[in-house]
Design a protein with these regions (language model features):
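Extracytoplasmic gate region of multi-pass secondary transporters
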Residues: 33-34, 207-255
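Helix-breaking motifs and short loop linkers at transmembrane-helix boundaries and internal kinks
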Residues: 45, 77, 99-104, 133, ...
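Helix-to-loop junctions at the C-terminal end of transmembrane segments
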Residues: 65-77, 258-269, 353-354
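C-terminal ends and interior cores of transmembrane alpha-helices
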Residues: 88-101, 280-292
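Cytoplasmic helix-loop-helix junction between adjacent transmembrane helices
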Residues: 110-146
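Helix-loop-helix hairpin linking two adjacent transmembrane segments in secondary transporters
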Residues: 134, 142-187
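C-terminal transmembrane helical hairpin of 12-TM major facilitator-type secondary transporters
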Residues: 271-317
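A late C-terminal transmembrane helix in Major Facilitator Superfamily
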Residues: 324-356
Length: 384
C-alpha cells in the first residue's frame, strides 16, 4: 500500500476520519439547492422548468469534468489540489448567488457552485480504497456517514438561515464551511503520489459503463425527487420549516443506510444491493403519490434510504473494476456519467409539473427506478 498520502495523517483510520469530515461538507453543498429553490422561485418569479435549469447548471458540466479530473489526478497525483479547488468553487458560487440580480446571473453563480461537485468523490475514493484494500465497502460506508450527515443537516441549516435572515445573508453564511474546509484539508492532507513505474492504459470497460448507467438511473430518480421534494411538500400544505424537517429526516435515514449498503456490498455484492434499492424506491414512490391516507414521511424516508444506500457501493464497485489502475478515472466516470444523466431530470420533472402537477411528475419518476432494477441484473457479481 502506498503511504505517501499518510505523511501528515499517519494511519488509515485518521485519513478516513479527515476525508469523512470533508465528505460531510461536500455533500452538505450537494443538496443545498433544493432548500433554496422555494425562496428562489418566489424571489426571481421562476417557473418549475426554470428552477430545474438551475439544477442542470450545477450538475451537467461537473459531470463532464469528473472523469477528466479523475484521470488527471491519476496521472499527476495532485488529488489534494483538486479537492481544495472544489470546496473553493462551492463558496465562490454561493457568494455570487448572493449578489445575483437576474436569472442569468443566478444560473452563472450556480454553474460555478456546481464545479465543486466534480472534485471530491473520485479523489477521496482513491485515497480510501488504497488505504483499505480488503474492506472497501465498510470503509466507504463509514465515509458515506459523513456525506449523510451533510445531507440531513443541509435542509435544517438552509431553511433555518433563510427563515432567520434574508436570502443574500443566508447564502453568504453558507459559504463559510467551504472556506474552513479548504484551510483544514490544506493543513492535514498530503498529495498521493503514484508508485507505479508505468502509466496504465486508458481503458473504459463494459462493466464500468453498465455501472455508470445503472447508478445514473438511480441518481436521475433521486435528484429530481430531492430537488422538488420541499416544493412538493409546500404545495401539499407544509410550511418551509416543516418541509425542511421532513427532508432532513429522509436524509438522516440515508445516513443510517450508507454503512448498511457498504456492509451488504462486502457480504453479498453490489448487484443485490442495486436491485433491492431500485425496486424498493419505485414501490415507495408509487405509494407516496397514490393519494392513500398513509404517513408520507415513512415512504419519503424509504425512498431516501434506498437511493443513498447505493452511493458508497457505486464508489466501491468503481474502484474494484479499476483494480488499482486509473481509480480516479473509474470513479469519476461512474459519478460523472451519473451526474450528467441526473442533471436533466429536474428540468424534465419541472416541465411535466408545469403541464400537469408535481404529483404526476413524481409518479413518472418510478420508470427510472424500474429501469435501474432491470439493468442491475447485468452488473458484476460479488468480488472475491
Amino acid at each position: 500500500m502506498s503511504t505517501s498520502h499518510l505523511k501528515k495523517i499517519n494511519t488509515p483510520e485518521k485519513l478516513l476520519g479527515v476525508l469523512t469530515a470533508g465528505h460531510l461538507v461536500n455533500d452538505f453543498y450537494n443538496v443545498t439547492l433544493p432548500f433554496l429553490l422555494p425562496t428562489l422561485i418566489i424571489t426571481f418569479d421562476l417557473s418549475f422548468f426554470q428552477a430545474g435549469i438551475l439544477s442542470i447548471a450545477t450538475s451537467l458540466f461537473s459531470g463532464l469534468l469528473q472523469p477528466v479530473l479523475g484521470y488527471a489526478a491519476d496521472r499527476s497525483g495532485k488529488r489534494k489540489a483538486v479537492i481544495l479547488c472544489g470546496f473553493l468553487a462551492f463558496s465562490v458560487g454561493l457568494v455570487a448567488a448572493g449578489f445575483a440580480t437576474s436569472y442569468i446571473m443566478l444560473v452563472a453563480a450556480f454553474f460555478i457552485f456546481g464545479l465543486g461537485k466534480s472534485t471530491f468523490h473520485a479523489q477521496s475514493t482513491n485515497f480510501i480504497t488504497s488505504a483499505f484494500p480488503t474492506s472497501r465497502g465498510r470503509a466507504m460506508g463509514i465515509h458515506g456517514i459523513g456525506g449523510s450527515i451533510g445531507n440531513f443537516s443541509a435542509p435544517i441549516i438552509a431553511t433555518s438561515l433563510i427563515v432567520a435572515f434574508a436570502l443574500r445573508e443566508a447564502v453568504f453564511l453558507m459559504a463559510i464551511p467551504g472556506i474552513l474546509m479548504v484551510i483544514f484539508l490544506a493543513w492535514t492532507l498530503s498529495d498521493q503520489v503514484s508508485n507505479q513505474k508505468q502509466t496504465p492504459p486508458l481503458m473504459i470497460s463494459r462493466k464500468l459503463i453498465l455501472l455508470a448507467i445503472n447508478f445514473g438511473l438511480i441518481l436521475m430518480f433521486y435528484e429530481a425527487f430531492l430537488v422538488f421534494l420541499p416544493t412538493f411538500l409546500i404545495e401539499a400544505g407544509s410550511s418551509l420549516s416543516e418541509a425542511g424537517f421532513i427532508a432532513a429526516f429522509m436524509l438522516f435515514v440515508g445516513f443510517l443506510a450508507q454503512p448498511v449498503g457498504g456492509y451488504i456490498h462486502d457480504r453479498m455484492g453490489g448487484k443485490v444491493l442495486f436491485a433491492a434499492s431500485s425496486i424498493t424506491a419505485a414501490v415507495a414512490l408509487l405509494v407516496l403519490t397514490s393519494g392513500w391516507d398513509l404517513p408520507a414521511i415513512l415512504f419519503i424516508a424509504l425512498i431516501g434510504a434506498s437511493a443513498t444506500a447505493t452511493f458508497p457501493v457505486a464508489l466501491a464497485m468503481g474502484s474494484e473494476i479499476a483494480d488499482g489502475a486509473n481509480v480516479g478515472l473509474s470513479v469519476g466516470m461512474v459519478f460523472g456519467v451519473a451526474g450528467m444523466l441526473a442533471s436533466v431530470t429536474p428540468a424534465m420533472t419541472g416541465y411535466i409539473a408545469d403541464l400537469f402537477d408535481m404529483q404526476t411528475a413524481f409518479r413518472l419518476l418510478t420508470v427510472l427506478a424500474l429501469a435501474a432494477f432491470g439493468l442491475s441484473f447485468f452488473l458484476p457479481g460479488k468480488s472475491t
